[in-house]
Amino acid sequence: MHLSSRKRVFVSFDFDHDEDLKNLLVGQAKHPDTPFDLADWSIKEAISGNWEQKARSRIRSVDLVIGICGEWTHTARGVGIELRIAREERKPFFLLWGRADRNCQRPIGIEPTEKMYRWTWDNLRALVGGAR
């Protein structure tokens, strides 16, 4: 895929429980025909001071935000805040069901009607391409 047509993506995830899932997405981003580049991801630091300002700056610089949902995502305040910022900045986002064999949770502030998509290569490519 031509580099200029690839989307710049920010990945929002629960650092305490789902860093392995972010690493899987990093691996998929290296696939030769991937439609995206991982530009940035969640910041591992306390939510205080200028954390939100840093997150907003990172999210502003991308085309799309991917929220990875795991079993404890509803307890990760930062994920909910990052997705709220994505909305405020009018950045499209979608949620991936991070663990196929587990009960994954939406972040705080995300409506139960917001779909979590199965994490498959075909789904990921389609979702990055705008199929939602």
State the predicted function of each range.
Residues E71-E89:
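Conserved TIR/SEFIR loop-to-helix hotspot centered on a Trp-containing motif
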Residues F93-N103:
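Short beta-alpha junction loops
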Residues R125-R132:
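A charged, well-structured terminal subsegment
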Residues M1-S61, R99, R132:
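Conserved N-terminal substructure of TIR/SEFIR domains
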Residues D101-K115:
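Glycine-rich, charge-decorated loop segments at or immediately adjacent to ligand/cofactor-binding or catalytic sites
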Residues V62-D63, T113:
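Short, well-ordered alpha-helix to beta-strand connector turns
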Residues K30-T34, I85-P92:
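Arginine/glycine-rich "motif VI" loop of SF2 helicases in the C-terminal RecA-like domain
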